[in-house]
């Protein structure tokens, strides 16, 4: 059974330019997205599923690009793009979130504004259809940066969010992944195999993320995930952690991470890329390569990032067999890829 996507595109952009520094319009803008990195091998992917991923990546990035082209903000583009990916069960975020050890779904997300360094994050929510929207509301409507669990959902209700029945997040493929991991645990008598996800026969990390540069020169980044299959004890990965899974700073770059969260937290991946650009004076591509190809593997982790700098240069760096990814520039040139050797 092929996982499906909801193609109802919910554009958050209302046609009004709300970017900062409107007087300094520029033509350079761009957007980059990812749908997760991991052991994604072509021989384990059938044509139908591969096409579904490619189509959804293209659909999602065009939502954000349309907003940017019309003069919308990078924050608007990032939130709307991730929102659309959360509504697609192909990805481990929102509708397609993986199951915890207990058979529930715990969702995480974060977003950051490169112009102000304001940020919002949420972790461990079970009744929020689009966690990226709640992360944005936490940034805009609360005095805090990060809320979790029941408290985050109480805040969401106060802000007018509708609570979603947990059955909405159920997909047969994700349940099969959980059951397979539990079977492996029993055979190996392993304490926890949360890092092994047999979905599409391989371990992979289906986090979704987006980074964007708007016409006003403002950067933004966002990330959303269901975490790791079979996670326990309210485990939180890098996706909702500002500086690890998400970071944006107008003076350097915007970064969204995907990978083995424990290592990305320890390496503070997203912020480290920005810091290397700021303090060492190296390019985005150089910084991303050092962090993803050296620092993260040296700790024992794997995964990848997408990033864009203040000049519109991009990076799609990963140390796994594949990463669902796409990029679109101001000229409308589109690149969509899945595997390493493309």
Task: Map each language-model feature to its residues.
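Alpha/propeptide regions of enzymes that mature by internal proteolysis
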Residues: 9-342
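C-terminal motif of bacterial Sec signal peptides marking the signal peptidase cleavage site
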Residues: 2-4
